[in-house]
Amino acid sequence: ALDTIAEPMWLYAQADLLATQHRYPAARGKLDSLITTWPGHPLEDEVLMQLAQMALAENDVDTAMVMLQEIVSLHFDDILADDALFQLADLHQNWLNDADAALPLYEQLLFEFPGSLHAIEARRRFRALRGDDTEL
């Protein structure tokens, strides 16, 4: 019998290689299969992040935002949650030019993930969007 723990890892590794090769449809198929076959698997946030990155590479901002929001909503305690939140805020700010939507996302990152690698940049952007005098 196959080791059911190793199989999702193998499938994810194959999808990651395909994504690195810019073979997005094939990678997406493997990732979708992983989510369908093993719902709730610990790799699910990595799968969603990979799907978001591929969507961004194809300029599909709407799909990327859905994937990132799903990570923030369902995997808020996982290692990629702060990355997803920062990317989501960045998309609102820089792709959609929607500072009003980006501001609370940066604030959420600062309060929920104060130790994040993104905290310094999120604080800088939050203050700039809020209109604070940053020349002090």
Q: What are these language model-derived features?
A:
Residues A1-L136:
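Acidic, polar-rich low-complexity tracts and alpha-helical solenoid repeat scaffolds
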